[in-house]
Amino acid sequence: MAVGKNKRISKGKKGGKKKAADPFAKKDWYDIKAPSVFSVRNVGKTLVTRTQGTKIASEGLEHRVFEISLADLQGDEDHSFRKIRLRAEDIQGKNVLTNFWGMDFTTDKLRSLVRKWQSLIEAHVDVKTTDSYTLRMFCIGFTKKRANQQKRTCYAQSSQIRQIRRKMREIMVNQAQSCDLKDLVQKFIPESIGREIEKATSSIYPLQNVFIRKVKILKAPKFDLGKLMEVHGDYNEDDIGTKLDRPAEEAVAEPTEVIGA
């Protein structure tokens, strides 16, 4: 009787099954440091592939943009509708030093502001700060009923909308051109520009919910480490590392004279 091949018995593959490589084994965690204008400085961590040969880890992190809620940066839930963009500018040790790179509204907040029986007024303008950052600022505002108004609607006329838009641009330019980026961000957080626009346009038509809803950075100046360290004002040496004393073995011993040589 011929002995046939048992097809059910499968041969084992040579070398066995390959072990899946852990994708995190070749990566490092870095701390993201926010500028000093925000209350919370250590805002999170980011991953980057470890330095291998000519591929340097810090180059992979350079100019990486992080989007963080202003509520997390300020520790206040009232600011949760605003998103802040921070760009990695420099890497020191395991810390990524960032700078402001724009902001925006959350979609749900923007949709909640738009209602019936009122006029929506928008304006945008390109401005240059004193430290040579070129920004595009977008402003939004809504008309509201005058005091003791019985009429259901509060629509502004086209001529009034043009006047309000002109006033919005004028205030945005004046506020941005008179300060640097750090001071301008400090104006964005408490909505001081929106309140100024509200006050200035009250004689034309009363407004409500006036916000700088979006800021885009169109052009940034050449990188300057000194300026970045000013933005991270209270960034101390403890974050970078501690200074170590030189070991005694490394100290050069003084030659001793041998008597009788």
From Swiss-Prot:
Primary localization: cytoplasm
Region Disordered, residue ranges: 1-20
Keywords assigned: Cytoplasm, Ribonucleoprotein, Ribosomal protein
Pfam families: Ribosomal_S3Ae
Gene Ontology CC terms, in alphabetical order: cytosolic small ribosomal subunit
Database matches in SMART domains: Ribosomal_S3Ae
Keyword Ribonucleoprotein: yes
Compositional bias annotation for Basic residues: 1-18
GO molecular function, one term: structural constituent of ribosome
UniProt entry tagged with the keyword tRNA processing: no
Cell compartment(s), UniProt: Cytoplasm
GO biological process: translation
Subunit field text: Component of the small ribosomal subunit. Mature ribosomes consist of a small (40S) and a large (60S) subunit. The 40S subunit contains about 33 different proteins and 1 molecule of RNA (18S). The 60S subunit contains about 49 different proteins and 3 molecules of RNA (25S, 5.8S and 5S).
Family statement drawn from the similarity comment of this UniProt entry: Belongs to the eukaryotic ribosomal protein eS1 family.
PANTHER family named among the record's database cross-references: 40S RIBOSOMAL PROTEIN S3A
HAMAP family: Ribosomal_eS1_euk
Protein name: Small ribosomal subunit protein eS1
Species per Swiss-Prot/TrEMBL record: Catharanthus roseus (Madagascar periwinkle)
Gene designation per UniProt: RPS3A
